[in-house]
C-alpha cells in the first residue's frame, strides 16, 4: 500500500516550501517532490534530521538522522547518514524545484522518517568530501534556513 507524507518548511527568514513524499510499498524508493522559495541562487544542503522538535526553531531538530552511526556522505554513497539527501538547487529567482528519488529513507518501519524534521541549509553540502571533520558530520552545509516536521498525508 502506498504511503504519503508532507513537510511544510518555514524559517526565520524568507525561505519556505512544501515537500511531498510518496513510497509505493515498503522497500521501494521514496519520491520527493515540491518547491522551496526565498533561497539564494545555487546549491543548498537538504537533510532529514533526527528529531521532530522545532521548539527552538530548526536547531532543536538535532543532527542528521543517522541510525547506523555512519559518516556523512552523498545520496549515492554507501557511507551516508539515512537523512543525507544531498542538495537542492535554486535558480536566480530563488526557487528550488525538488525532485528526488531515494532508496535509503523510508516512510515506514524501524527507521521511518515520519515525525522527523526536514531541513534546508544555507550552503552547499560537500557530500562528506570537504577534507575536515565537520564535512563528515554535516557536509559543511552551514546554518539551517528553514525546516518542518514530516507528517503522514492522505
Swiss-Prot record:
GO terms for biological process: action potential initiation; anterograde axonal transport; apoptotic process; auditory receptor cell stereocilium organization; cellular response to ATP; cellular response to cadmium ion; cellular response to potassium ion; determination of adult lifespan. The modification N6-acetyllysine is found at residues 123, 137. The modification N-acetylalanine is found at residue 2. Zn(2+) binds at residues 64, 72, 81, 84. It comes from the Eukaryota. Its EC number is 1.15.1.1. It is found in: Cytoplasm; Nucleus. Binds 1 copper ion per subunit. Binds 1 zinc ion per subunit. Disulfide bonds join 58-147. One of its GO terms (molecular function) is zinc ion binding. GO terms for cellular component: axon cytoplasm; cytoplasm; cytoplasmic vesicle; cytosol; dendrite cytoplasm; dense core granule; extracellular space; lysosome. The keyword Nuclease does not apply. A lipid is attached at residue 7 (S-palmitoyl cysteine). The keyword Nucleus applies. Gene3D superfamilies: Superoxide dismutase, copper/zinc binding domain. Cu cation binds at residues 47, 49, 64, 121. Keywords: Acetylation, Antioxidant, Copper, Cytoplasm, Disulfide bond, Lipoprotein, Metal-binding, Nucleus, Oxidoreductase, Palmitate, Phosphoprotein, Zinc. CDD domains: Cu-Zn_Superoxide_Dismutase. The modification N6-succinyllysine is found at residues 4, 10, 92, 123, 137. Palmitoylation helps nuclear targeting and decreases catalytic activity. Succinylation, adjacent to copper catalytic site, probably inhibits activity. Desuccinylation by SIRT5 enhances activity. Belongs to the Cu-Zn superoxide dismutase family. Homodimer; non-disulfide-linked. Heterodimer with SOD1. The heterodimer CCS:SOD1 interacts with SLC31A1; this heterotrimer is Cu(1+)-mediated and its maintenance is regulated through SOD1 activation. This is Superoxide dismutase [Cu-Zn].
Amino acid at each position: 500500500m502506498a504511503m504519503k507524507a508532507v513537510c511544510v518548511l518555514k524559517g526565520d527568514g524568507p525561505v519556505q516550501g512544501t515537500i511531498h513524499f510518496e513510497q509505493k510499498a515498503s522497500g521501494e524508493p521514496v519520491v520527493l517532490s515540491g518547491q522551496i522559495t526565498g533561497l539564494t541562487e545555487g546549491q543548498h544542503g537538504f537533510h532529514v534530521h533526527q528529531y521532530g522538535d522545532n521548539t527552538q526553531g530548526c536547531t532543536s531538530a538535532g543532527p542528521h538522522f543517522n541510525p547506523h552511526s555512519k559518516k556523512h556522505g552523498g545520496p549515492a554513497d554507501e557511507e551516508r547518514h539515512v537523512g543525507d539527501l544531498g542538495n537542492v538547487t535554486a535558480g536566480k529567482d530563488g526557487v528550488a524545484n525538488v525532485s528526488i528519488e531515494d532508496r535509503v529513507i523510508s516512510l515506514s518501519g524501524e527507521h521511518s522518517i515520519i515525525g522527523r524534521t526536514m531541513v534546508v541549509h544555507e550552503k552547499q553540502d560537500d557530500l562528506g568530501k570537504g577534507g575536515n571533520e565537520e564535512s563528515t558530520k554535516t557536509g559543511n552545509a552551514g546554518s539551517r534556513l528553514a525546516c518542518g516536521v514530516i507528517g503522514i498525508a492522505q
